[in-house]
From Swiss-Prot:
<keyword id="KW-0808">Transferase</keyword>
<feature type="domain" description="GST C-terminal">
    <location>
        <begin position="115"/>
        <end position="249"/>
    </location>
</feature>
<dbReference type="GO" id="GO:0004364">
    <property type="term" value="F:glutathione transferase activity"/>
</dbReference>
<comment type="similarity">
    <text>Belongs to the GST superfamily.</text>
</comment>
<protein>
    <recommendedName>
        <fullName>Glutathione S-transferase tcpG</fullName>
        <ecNumber>2.5.1.18</ecNumber>
    </recommendedName>
</protein>
<dbReference type="InterPro" id="IPR004046">
    <property type="entry name" value="GST_C"/>
</dbReference>
<dbReference type="Pfam" id="PF00043">
    <property type="entry name" value="GST_C"/>
</dbReference>
<dbReference type="InterPro" id="IPR036249">
    <property type="entry name" value="Thioredoxin-like_sf"/>
</dbReference>
<comment type="function">
    <text>Glutathione S-transferase; part of the gene cluster that mediates the biosynthesis of an unusual class of epipolythiodioxopiperazines (ETPs) lacking the reactive thiol group important for toxicity. Firstly, L-tyrosine is prenylated by tcpD, before undergoing condensation with L-glycine in a reaction catalyzed by the NRPS tcpP leading to the diketopiperazine (DKP) backbone. Afterwards the alpha-carbon of tyrosine is oxidized by the cytochrome P450 tcpC to form a hydroxyl group.</text>
</comment>
<dbReference type="Pfam" id="PF13409">
    <property type="entry name" value="GST_N_2"/>
</dbReference>
<dbReference type="InterPro" id="IPR010987">
    <property type="entry name" value="Glutathione-S-Trfase_C-like"/>
</dbReference>
<dbReference type="InterPro" id="IPR036282">
    <property type="entry name" value="Glutathione-S-Trfase_C_sf"/>
</dbReference>
<comment type="pathway">
    <text>Secondary metabolite biosynthesis.</text>
</comment>
<dbReference type="InterPro" id="IPR004045">
    <property type="entry name" value="Glutathione_S-Trfase_N"/>
</dbReference>
<feature type="domain" description="GST N-terminal">
    <location>
        <begin position="20"/>
        <end position="109"/>
    </location>
</feature>
<dbReference type="InterPro" id="IPR040079">
    <property type="entry name" value="Glutathione_S-Trfase"/>
</dbReference>
Length: 249
């Protein structure tokens, strides 16, 4: 008889590289899992992926993210606990992961800012996104679109429109090709674009053409080779070849 898995014990994972904890990309891939994948691919950081099948059953994971949400990561660096023992560093919240990975690996500040002025711009847009478009866009994708929810969905739709208006105004400033910095993409672009694109707009019954600068920017982000790699991976996380074919991924 096959031994049952002990969901209270941390499973064996790679010890020589960062481990990213995510869920399977069915029924749909998530924007939050995509964000750390973007910076991992952009900075070519070695990593492995571990799939979480049940957030409620796999109680060992609650030590990695006390909010019991995905994604999260464990790095190879050790931290000391209050009891004096050592454990791997855990980072949760996708925006926190973007900042952490840049602090550790982006030595030139390409994606997080080369000085305090640039960093302030990047983190301002990143954190504002988490409170604005990140929250409203995620709720739109999660809620069932039935008649009883129409008033709530209308509120979320209007909030998404306001967020797109802000992006459109920002991109209308002279020389502003990207969201935070004018000359190059940053983690602010990585965080925002998964919820500012034609697919999300279409799901919210919003015509993305109404924000032409935002649409052009979103397409420019998609053309970045490392973003394309991250999205392809995110779309197929944990899926078999049969599932990939069935879902057209």
């Amino acid at each position: 008889m096959e031994a049952q898995q002990d969901f209270t014990k941390h499973p064996e994972v790679a010890q020589d590289r960062l481990v990213l904890y995510v869920r399977k990309a069915i029924p749909a891939p998530t924007a939050n899992s995509l964000k750390p994948l973007m910076i991992l691919e952009a900075l070519e950081i070695p990593y492995s992926i571990h799939l979480i099948s049940s957030l409620s059953q796999e109680t060992w994971y609650h030590e990695i993210n006390p909010y019991k949400q995905l994604p999260a990561l464990e790095d190879i660096d050790l931290v000391e606990t209050s009891g004096g023992s050592k454990r791997r560093l855990n980072v949760f919240d996708s925006s926190a992961m973007l900042i952490y990975l840049c602090d550790k690996h982006d030595k030139d500040g390409l994606f997080i800012g080369r000085n305090a002025t640039e960093r302030a711009q990047v983190t301002s847009w990143l954190i504002a996104y988490a409170a604005g478009l990140g929250a409203t866009g995620e709720w739109w994708l999660k809620m069932r679109h039935d008649e009883n929810l129409k008033p709530a969905l209308r509120v979320i739709e209007n909030a998404i429109r306001r967020e797109y208006d802000i992006l459109e105004k920002r991109l209308g400033e002279p020389g502003q090709r990207w969201i935070a910095l004018a000359d190059r993409p940053t983690v602010a672009d990585f965080a925002i674009q998964p919820l500012a694109n034609p697919r999300v707009a279409r799901n919210a019954a919003i015509d993305f053409e109404a924000w032409p600068r935002t649409k052009a920017w979103s397409e420019a982000v998609d053309r970045l080779a490392y973003i394309d790699r991250a999205k392809r991976l995110n779309n197929k996380l944990g899926m078999t070849e049969e599932e990939i074919e069935l879902h057209g991924r």
